[in-house]
UniProtKB/Swiss-Prot annotation:
GO molecular function: small ribosomal subunit rRNA binding; structural constituent of ribosome
InterPro entries given in the database record: Ribosomal_bS6, Ribosomal_bS6_sf, Ribosomal_S6_plastid/chlpt, Transl_elong_EF1B/ribsomal_bS6
Domain of life from the UniProt record: Bacteria
One of the Pfam families matching this protein, by short name: Ribosomal_S6
GO biological process: translation
Keywords attached to this entry: Ribonucleoprotein, Ribosomal protein, RNA-binding, rRNA-binding
PANTHER family in UniProt: MITOCHONDRIAL 28S RIBOSOMAL PROTEIN S6 (PTHR21011), SMALL RIBOSOMAL SUBUNIT PROTEIN BS6M (PTHR21011:SF1)
Entry-linked HAMAP family: Ribosomal_bS6 (MF_00360)
Designated name of the protein: Small ribosomal subunit protein bS6
Gene source species: Chloroherpeton thalassium (strain ATCC 35110 / GB-78)
Keyword Iron: no
Gene3D superfamilies associated with the record: 3.30.70.60
Transmembrane residue ranges: none
Listed SUPFAM superfamilies: Ribosomal protein S6
Amino acid sequence: MKKLYETTIVVDGGLDESVIAATVEKVTGLITSLGCEVKTVLDVGRKNLAYPIGKATIGYYVHIEFESDGTALKELERQYRLNESIIRFLTIILDKRLLEMRERVLKYGAPPQTSEDNSSEGEEFVEEKKSSE
């Protein structure tokens, strides 16, 4: 039975754009060559790392969703370790609850604002009321 997985890779952000693009292409090609089906590829882009990893202080983040029966994960993560452009990676199973939550967000949009978010608007209204007296 195939499950839905998400892998996040962090490529060294100090590399040239063409090297980063080639690394992402190589990873997606590797996933398909291992018998998995790539669903989505999301390039998040460059972000400052919370702490240096080796000499890298900037990382290029990529999220890839794919379906697999789980047999390819060991080889996939071995290839991540061998690729010097990839400085970090994480692969997780997307469970049913997370997928349902994503569908709800897509269907209904962003969650409603809380009362804390609207507190500044209420203060402005009170100030306007006082000035009109």
